Every structure is written in C-alpha cells, then in structure tokens.
A protein has these predicted regions:
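Phosphate/diphosphate-binding loops
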Residues: 194, 202-224
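Dynamic "connector" segments at or just before major functional cores
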Residues: 1-146, 157, 164-177, 182
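Catalytic cores of nucleotide-enabled group-transfer and carboxylate-activating enzymes in metabolic
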Residues: 149, 167-169, 195-198
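Active-site beta-loop-alpha junctions of metal-dependent nucleic acid enzymes
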Residues: 177-199
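Short, solvent-exposed amphipathic alpha-helical segments in soluble enzyme
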Residues: 145-148, 222-223
Length: 224
C-alpha cells in the first residue's frame, strides 16, 4: 500500500467557487513546537485565571506570533493570515484588540516567564548581556501618548516610540522595554536592567553596548 501509485486528476477548465478557500498555510506548525515548549500556553492560562475573560488568549497570542514570523503586518492583517491556517481561529477580530490591553499590561510577566522556561530548551548564555536601542515610526501627524517626535532611525518627520532590548551572549532576546520617542535612550537602561536583576535572576553578567550606551553614568550604574 505504501508503494502504490496514486493518480490525481486536474481539470484546467474547472472554475473555482467564489469565496471558497483554496489556500492553506501550514508554516506556523514549525514555530508552534517552540511556542508550547516555552509553555506560553500555561502563561496564558494564568492570565485567564487572573482576568476571567471569555476569549481564548492562548489562541490569540499564538496566532499573532505565528503571523508575525510568517508575514509581519497589522493585527487586522494578521487575523486574515491566521484565517488561512490549517487550524481556524476560535476568536473574532475584536477579541484581538481586547487582548492587546492584557498582553501589554502583563508584558513584563510574560517576558520573565518565557526566559525561565527557555532554560528547558537549553542553557542560556546570560553571563554576557548586550544592550541596544532602536525606534519605530508611526504614520500619524500628532503626538499621542508615548509616541513623541524624536530622532528616528529612518529620519522620518513622524512621532516615534523607542525600544531598548537585552540579548544574551548568543544573540537571543532576553528582555525589552518601550519608552517615549523624545526620551534620552540612556535613561532606559536602569529600569530594564533592574527588571533583569530582580525578575529574571540574572545577578552577575558582563554588560556590553556601543559607545552611545556606555556613558560614565551607565558605567557607574553597572559598577555600583
């Protein structure tokens, strides 16, 4: 039976029914393995028990991650991408927008839990930590919240928001934080480093950065 030939017939003049899905995406099955090995489903279960919401935040978070890897786009477009997965979304678009507030509020908790669970996949090279900052522009004309006018990497005349990130010695992300676009990036280090020390348990490491984030004030913080 395994060696038996199978013949498939195609009709070149056959018309497809309008609205019938003919494309299915299966690429998400590869990152799905790591999603569950990092126990993100259990993290989502803790959030569900805390907030008592009705929608499936595990399905939402996992689909957003898969879509971000496969085809980065807006949340609305990511929902459309997820609708083409072999496993259909069990939620609606408005549930995604509701879940974003929870994911934003619990961002630090999610990061620390993922870091702890990442040790189940292998040893982390966290004796050396690299820190750097970047920023992202928004196609808006007026400042809004932390989206402020600042010096953007792409030199666009749009409000930006900045991100600082720690990576381990292997270049794997460890923790990140977002801060206003008009803030001095050097001030972003101390709060995030405090979280790494307290929530991540990284109490002894070598700090590495470029010259812009290696000021005398930062050196004093790391040698205190």
């Amino acid at each position: 039976q395994q060696t038996k030939a199978v013949q498939i017939t195609f009709h070149s003049d056959h018309k497809l029914d309008y609205g019938q899905q003919v494309l299915y995406r299966g690429g998400y099955l590869f990152p799905q393995t790591f999603y569950y090995r990092l126990k993100l489903d259990k993290i989502c279960r803790k959030l569900r028990d805390k907030y008592k919401f009705k929608y499936d935040i595990n399905a939402i978070l996992s689909d957003l991650i898969y879509a971000r890897i496969l085809e980065p786009a807006s949340k609305r477009s990511s929902y459309k991408t997820a609708s083409e997965f072999l496993e259909k979304p069990s939620y609606q678009l408005h549930d995604i927008y509701r879940a974003l507030d929870v994911l934003g509020n619990e961002c630090d908790f999610i990061q620390s839990e993922v870091y702890k669970n990442s040790h189940l996949l292998g040893k982390r090279n966290d004796a050396i930590l690299y820190y750097d900052c970047t920023n992202y522009f928004f196609e808006i004309e007026q400042e809004d919240g932390d989206r402020k006018y600042g010096k953007g990497k792409e030199h666009r005349p749009n409000p930006i928001i900045q991100m600082g990130m720690f990576m381990d010695g292997d270049g794997i992300p460890l923790a990140f934080s977002l801060f206003p676009g008009n803030a001095n990036e050097q001030t972003s280090l101390k709060p995030l480093e405090g979280k790494v020390l307290q929530d991540f348990g990284c109490t002894k490491f070598i700090y590495c950065s470029d010259a812009g984030l290696g000021s005398e004030a930062i050196k004093k913080i790391n040698h205190a």
